Regions:
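Active-site nucleophile loop of the alpha/beta-hydrolase fold
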Residues: 213-223
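Glycine-rich nucleophile elbow surrounding the catalytic serine of serine-hydrolase chemistry
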Residues: 192-204
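Alpha/beta-hydrolase fold nucleophile elbow
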Residues: 182-194
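Short, surface-exposed "cap/lid" segments of acyl-processing enzymes
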Residues: 77-141, 145, 149-153
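Catalytic active-site module of serine/aspartate enzymes centered on a nucleophile-bearing elbow/loop
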Residues: 298-316
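Alpha/beta-hydrolase active-site loop
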Residues: 157-181
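The feature captures the conserved acid-bearing segment of alpha/beta-hydrolase catalytic domains
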Residues: 222-294, 309-313
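A domain-start/cap signature at the N-terminus of enzymes
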Residues: 12-101
Length: 316
């Protein structure tokens, strides 16, 4: 298998794997952060539908997205077309056959700082999040956790130039799970934080499902571009707000909630553009919240209250 050097033009021939010799312990993604030419090379790989999956012996390894399933042995992932997810069922005391089956669909959050630029796909695209969530939910809840398997750090579950059918396949995968489990639409909730919040509110409004989105990344352009930190510029649309507002104008039978905070003005400004006559937007005033990553951990009780309300239909 040919190994390309950093200064060498990559010859794209639809090959399954592409190897890049970085000459460093750092992977190409890490190097791209500080070098615009390497960033352009990295984005060229993304645009041609390659995903970084490993770095060893000073070599970064990329795999064509349609073949990444070969890398996921032992990860307990279910594949629907090119969408990957984990599905768990209620266990032990969380089973109650006297109430309807329910489904929570979780869209992955962004990885933490230590794994943000990890060469491993699961670290970037399905990082651990609220692994014991089911313990705090009503009974009979199935959980579907969707990996954001696209480009560098996922595309926040949005179509990209290299994957124009992504949204459709995500929505089909959810409908497939719901129908196979024989769960009524009214017993399904979409949920996500940050990147996952964007996915939840985008697809939740597209399909009209109950939704909780926590400080969603609704726009990656303008003041939120941040030197293309998410490595998505030019690969997908920037602003999701017009589509979300159009979706709820067309159909909005089921309740949708966004949690945000005025203490994080860049994200708050975007949430304030949402049609709050159709979607409930909650501004959490809390001095403990000083940045985007702090919104979710400081609103866990509120999130659980809303999720259980949406799942059970019980409100006081």
């Amino acid at each position: 298998m040919k190994v390309f050097n950093l200064n060498e033009d990559i010859k794209f021939e639809n090959q399954e794997r592409i190897l890049i010799k970085t000459g460093s312990d750092k992977n190409l993604l890490q190097l791209a952060r500080k070098d615009k030419d390497l960033k352009a090379k990295y984005k060229e790989l993304l645009a041609n539908d390659y995903i970084l999956y490993f770095h060893d012996k000073e070599t970064s390894r990329f795999c064509k997205r349609e073949h990444v399933n070969k890398l996921f042995n032992g990860l307990n992932l279910v594949q629907y077309k090119n969408v990957f997810y984990r599905l768990s069922q209620p266990q032990g005391r969380k089973v109650n056959d006297k109430v309807s089956k329910k489904l929570i669909v979780i869209f992955a959050k962004m990885p933490g700082a230590q794994q943000y630029d990890s060469p491993k796909i699961p670290h970037r695209m399905l990082p651990p999040f609220f692994d014991d969530l089911e313990r705090s939910l009503v009974k009979n809840v199935y959980t579907m956790r969707i990996m954001d398997t696209n480009v560098s750090h996922g595309s926040h579950y949005i179509n990209t130039t290299n994957y124009p059918d992504y949204e459709q396949e995500i929505q089909e995968s959810i409908e497939n799970v719901r129908k196979n489990l024989d769960i009524e639409k009214e017993n399904v909730v979409f949920y996500g934080v940050s990147r996952g919040g964007a996915g939840a509110i985008y697809h939740g409004t597209a399909l009209d499902y109950k939704t909780l989105a926590v400080d969603p990344i609704l726009n990656i352009g303008g003041k939120l571009e941040a030197n293309d930190r998410r490595i998505l510029k030019g690969l997908r649309i920037n602003d999701l707000v017009p589509t979300v507002n159009l979706n709820v104008a067309n159909s909005n039978k089921y309740q949708k909630v966004i949690i945000c905070s005025e203490n994080v003005p860049l994200y708050y400004e975007q949430s304030m553009r949402i049609n709050n006559e159709k979607i409930k937007v909650l501004n959490m005033k809390d001095d403990k919240i000083t940045s985007h990553p702090e919104v979710s951990p400081n609103t866990v009780p509120e999130q659980l209250m809303i999720l259980n309300n949406l799942l059970s239909g019980i409100s006081v």
